[in-house]
């Protein structure tokens, strides 16, 4: 098996990862003389800021996803391949993937980050992350299925376990999913589940630090905490989760909370490249790059977004924030630098610009910070809607999301409360199992 892309005479740029950063590079190379190959394990781009709305059954997964091939269908020198990265061999300018190997002139690593369980294997096994569309759909099924089962279960203890929701992580994802589930409890349960007392549903938000939204100002943290408490969310600060057993989330102080809906959004970790030398890894095992996003010591390999860290920026000594705006800015700068390389011009250094931070917890409840301006309430919420709507790919998706938001706003009703358990065809199951055992590099390179 191979990627089946003829090399030709053009310089080839291989991009691994079609998130915000990778897509920005690919779009920025339009009209250039480069051959571009985009590799991603999915055949679509997903919009992470709205994944929590899929998880809460408030939005269709297709509304925040966009097929790569549609985005690039008019590009002659662009190729997409659905595959996973296995290893890189810079000395041979070779990339190993789950479907074979491919040569490159320039390589861009933009695979982003994954959920960080901080080495806790038991929590990793039982907790439900919310980083991808697939994970959000799985979480949606779990939430709805647990509510259904709570009506027919045999004991009060089991019912409480099914209706308790524990969210670990007080960042933007944590406060957003806690807020939207609280709204679901207040508006959906009384309408759809007449034989269920909504007050039995408890939502817990656990944060190891001393405040929510630690990346924002104390004022925004206080505002969000006030909103959530008013919405009935139980907030536990300075509490660390150590384990999950017997349907209980166990805290460091020995206390526990019974639940069968255990959501983990407590940080991210950079995607790892299995054979990359440890010398290239920095804080948080992010790949060290210079001010041009070039991996130190590897002139033709670049890394952008959540996967990389630029050390030495006095304004961000621990690295730039792992946010969409960072990946977009780095991707844009790198695309421009590839154009400059083609013309023999010097590269421009990357300089991060903080465009602001926002978080929403529910209808008319949000916080936003832009430079010295801090907002909360309706206008922050409205600004959040506008910014995210503009960022979604595709006119159809923008229209669908806007109409969905309008419907939910005026009717207090989410219409997607259906449980789907997709069954993969045997051919697909066999192929996935086969690809997990093959194409790991060294054996294939020797052939």
Q: Locations of the language-model features?
A:
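Beta1-alpha1 glycine-rich phosphate/pyrophosphate-binding loop at the start
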Residues: 2-81, 172-215, 263, 446-447
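Glycine-rich, N-terminal phosphate-binding loop of Rossmann-like dinucleotide-binding domains
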Residues: 18, 99, 111-112, 253, ...
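Short glycine-rich anion-binding loops that position phosphate/pyrophosphate groups of nucleotides
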Residues: 112-115, 178, 268-270
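C-terminal, flexible cofactor-proximal segment of oxidoreductases
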Residues: 326, 330, 335-447
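FAD-binding core/adjacent interface of flavoenzyme oxidoreductases
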Residues: 1-12, 78-166, 263
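A Rossmann-like FAD-binding core segment of flavoenzymes
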Residues: 76-87, 182-291, 295-297, 347
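FAD-site-proximal beta/loop scaffold in flavoenzymes
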Residues: 125-156, 247-250, 256-329
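Rossmann-like dinucleotide-binding core of oxidoreductases
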Residues: 159-216, 223, 234-236, 321-349, ...
């Amino acid at each position: 098996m191979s990627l089946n892309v003829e090399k030709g005479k053009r310089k080839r740029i291989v991009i691994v990862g079609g998130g915000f950063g990778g897509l920005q590079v690919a779009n920025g190379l339009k009209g250039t003389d480069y051959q571009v190959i985009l590799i991603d394990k999915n055949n679509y781009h997903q919009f992470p800021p709205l994944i929590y709305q899929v998880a809460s059954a408030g939005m269709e997964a297709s509304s925040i996803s966009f097929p790569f091939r549609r985005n690039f269908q008019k590009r002659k020198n662009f190729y997409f391949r659905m595959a996973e990265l296995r290893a890189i061999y810079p000395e041979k300018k070779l990339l190993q993937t789950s479907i074979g190997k491919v040569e490159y002139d320039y390589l861009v690593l933009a695979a982003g980050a994954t959920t960080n369980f901080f080495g806790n294997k038991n929590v990793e096994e039982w907790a439900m992350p919310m980083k991808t569309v697939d994970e959000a759909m799985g979480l949606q099924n779990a939430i709805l299925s647990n509510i259904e089962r709570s009506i027919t279960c045999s004991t009060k203890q089991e019912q409480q376990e099914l209706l308790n929701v524990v969210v670990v992580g007080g960042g933007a994802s944590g406060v957003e999913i806690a807020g939207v589930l609280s709204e679901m409890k207040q508006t959906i349960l009384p309408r759809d589940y007449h034989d269920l007392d909504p007050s039995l549903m408890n939502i817990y938000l656990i944060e190891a630090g001393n405040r929510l939204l630690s990346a924002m100002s104390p004022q925004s943290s206080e505002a969000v905490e006030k909103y959530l408490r008013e919405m009935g969310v139980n907030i536990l600060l300075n509490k660390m989760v150590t384990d999950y057993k017997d349907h209980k989330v166990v805290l460091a102080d020995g206390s526990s909370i019974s639940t069968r809906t255990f959501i983990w959004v407590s940080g991210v970790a950079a995607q790892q490249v299995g054979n990359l030398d440890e010398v290239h890894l920095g804080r948080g095992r992010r790949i060290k790059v210079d001010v041009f996003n070039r991996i130190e010591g590897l002139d033709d390999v670049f890394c952008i977004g959540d996967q990389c860290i630029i050390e030495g920026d006095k304004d961000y000594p621990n690295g730039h924030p792992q946010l969409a705006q960072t990946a977009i800015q780095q991707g844009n700068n790198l695309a421009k630098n590839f154009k400059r390389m083609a013309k023999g011009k010097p590269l421009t250094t990357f300089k991060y610009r903080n465009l602001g931070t926002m978080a929403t917890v529910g209808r008319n409840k949000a916080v936003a910070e832009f430079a010295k301006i801090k907002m909360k309430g309706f206008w922050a919420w409205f600004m959040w809607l506008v910014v995210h709507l503009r960022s979604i790919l595709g006119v159809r998706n923008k229209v669908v999301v806007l109409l969905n938001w309008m419907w939910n706003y005026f009717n207090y009703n989410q219409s997607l409360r259906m449980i789907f358990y997709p069954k993969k065809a045997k051919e697909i199951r066999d192929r996935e199992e086969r690809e997990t055992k093959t194409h790991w590099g060294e054996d294939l390179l020797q052939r």
